[in-house]
């Protein structure tokens, strides 16, 4: 978007924060969205708020939903603090905001800077100019981007996953983290200014470094319909990164930042295991190595007391991982390999020597790519031929410190050609050991078949387990349905029981009344019968006295 849209909300004019970040203004850092802009600049209410669409109107929102709740910033605040020229907010403007001429920013190590501009990344520099760091050395191209797994990504105090630009390799001395992304993600205000301040505890080279980032401009003006396809414009800009040591320095020296306390504890826990842990704890932390590594070469060649003369080809690592260590220019492809070719009368000893020399270079991952047996008296001739092959194909890498370095192309067909040349030279100079070479090839083929079978078995096991998991999931769903049905039936029975209980209580009340009435009636009858009996007894006594008196009168 190349212009800002003004909306009226609660008697104030606002810009959408996302529109401001889409402008990609040169004096502002690169933000992924408007929320990052508001958080990084510390914009407070009422200078900003959240709104969401309700029909054709915008209503106030709480900002919880990143999808529907849009951050907006007051026009007055944006013009005073965020925008350089007010012309960019006019809707009639149709020109893209591209700054053709940018000034080169020179940062001195000993300069103390307290202005807000210290948190801004240096502007884009057209072409690959000679840039130098505080140590006086030329700033090289940035190593390749390292993609982290989801479980490896950083989280803030709210357990939110952060998108941090990471470059280099998985080595503590060759991995780099974007200062701008760390500042925004962990809410570390003015991190760049802190690093560059006069009294800073950050040391260039140890805690932070500069790299040149390649920028490819693929923007095409759609209004100009031209059949000619122009090449994208490539430019470079200087960017600051923290090293792994600098990252932990930030964790331990920054106050008030939104760091994940659990992550800090996890770091110290594992560091303790490595330093003072038991052997069992250390073994659990050890990672499994893949490919023919230095340790595997040790395991193979220490089983025999015989020396193994050979011409060899080691891969030290990819160009993108070693670009900073070898100070390589942009003419080398990121995915090509840097190799070491040569001869030796003892492949095991030479592996240990190269591990000591090249294995400790930042970004290196030393592997024995290929080796073939050559009779000792033919080693010099074989080495000369193999180096001539690399020289004729223009694959020799000149380095002021290391010799016999070569470039191994990333294409499989080119790698196969190199290996075929090694095999041809071996067949030419192997002599009586030709049969041994063939036997080694057979063993290598056997190893490949075993590895393939092992891989297939693993795939089958994973497929089986995945099917079992799906089966268990279906069974669990059926069980949940049965449980829900059972709970429903229980609820129905509970209702029936309550109804019967009420009915029983009602019936018991009626029977109690009936029983009381019966008792009253029986008591009434008993009292009536007693009265009747008393009356009859009285009448009888009267009759008896009357008869006695009549008899006495008669006797008289």
UniProtKB/Swiss-Prot annotation:
Coiled coil found in the keyword field: yes
Biased composition (Low complexity): 523-539
Region of interest (Disordered), residue spans: 523-556
Chain coiled-coil ranges: 427-503
Alphabetized UniProt keyword annotations: Coiled coil
Compositionally biased intervals (Basic residues): 540-556
Domain of life: Viruses
Family: Belongs to the mimivirus L5 family.
Name this protein carries in UniProt: Uncharacterized protein R821
């Amino acid at each position: 978007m190349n212009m800002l849209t003004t909306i009226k909300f609660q008697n104030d004019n606002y810009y959408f924060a996302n529109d401001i970040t889409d402008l990609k203004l040169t004096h502002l850092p690169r933000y992924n969205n408007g929320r990052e802009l508001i958080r990084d600049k510390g914009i407070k209410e009422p200078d900003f708020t959240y709104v969401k669409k309700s029909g054709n109107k915008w209503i106030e929102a709480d900002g919880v939903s990143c999808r529907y709740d849009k951050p907006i910033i007051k026009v007055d605040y944006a013009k005073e603090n965020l925008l350089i020229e007010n012309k960019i907010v006019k809707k009639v403007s149709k020109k893209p905001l591209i700054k053709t001429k940018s000034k080169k920013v020179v940062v001195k190590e000993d300069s103390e800077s307290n202005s807000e501009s210290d948190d801004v990344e240096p502007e884009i520099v057209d072409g690959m100019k000679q840039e130098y760091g505080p140590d006086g050395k030329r700033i090289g191209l940035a190593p390749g981007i390292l993609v982290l797994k989801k479980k490896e990504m950083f989280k803030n105090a709210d357990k939110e996953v952060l998108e941090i630009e990471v470059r280099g390799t998985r080595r503590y001395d060759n991995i780099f983290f974007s200062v701008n992304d760390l500042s925004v993600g962990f809410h570390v205000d003015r991190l760049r200014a802190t690093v560059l301040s006069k009294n800073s505890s950050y040391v260039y080279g140890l805690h932070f470094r500069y790299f040149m980032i390649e920028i490819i401009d693929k923007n095409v003006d759609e209004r100009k319909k031209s059949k000619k396809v122009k090449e994208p414009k490539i430019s470079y800009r200087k960017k600051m990164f923290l090293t792994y040591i600098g990252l932990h320095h930030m964790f331990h020296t920054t106050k008030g930042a939104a760091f994940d306390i659990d992550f800090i504890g996890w770091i110290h826990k594992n560091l303790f295991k490595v330093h003072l842990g038991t052997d069992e704890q250390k073994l659990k932390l050890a990672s499994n190595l893949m490919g023919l590594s230095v340790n595997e070469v040790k395991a193979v060649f220490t089983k025999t007391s015989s020396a193994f003369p050979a011409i060899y080809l080691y891969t030290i690592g990819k160009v993108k991982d070693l670009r900073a260590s070898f100070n390589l220019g942009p003419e080398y492809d990121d995915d090509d390999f840097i190799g070491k070719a040569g001869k030796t009368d003892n492949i095991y000893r030479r592996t240990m020597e190269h591990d000591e020399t090249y294995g400790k270079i930042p970004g290196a991952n030393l592997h024995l790519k290929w080796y073939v047996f050559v009779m000792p008296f033919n080693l010099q001739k074989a080495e000369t031929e193999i180096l001539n092959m690399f020289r004729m194909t223009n694959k020799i890498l000149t380095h002021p410190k290391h010799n016999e370095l070569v470039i191994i192309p990333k294409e499989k067909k080119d790698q196969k050609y190199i290996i075929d040349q090694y095999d041809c030279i071996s067949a030419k100079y192997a002599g009586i050991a030709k049969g041994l070479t063939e036997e080694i090839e057979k063993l290598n083929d056997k190893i490949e078949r075993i590895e393939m079978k092992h891989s297939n078995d693993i795939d089958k096991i994973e497929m089986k387990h995945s099917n079992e998991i799906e089966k268990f999931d279906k069974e669990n769903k059926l069980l949940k349905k049965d449980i829900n049905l059972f709970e429903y039936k229980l609820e129905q029975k509970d209702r029936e029981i309550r109804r019967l209980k009420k009915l029983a209580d009602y019936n018991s009340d009626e029977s109690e009344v009936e029983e009381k009435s019966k008792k009253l009636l029986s008591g009434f009858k008993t009292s009536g019968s007693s009265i009747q009996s008393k009356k009859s007894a009285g009448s009888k006594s009267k009759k008896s006295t009357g008869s006695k008196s009549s008899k006495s009168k008669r006797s008289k």
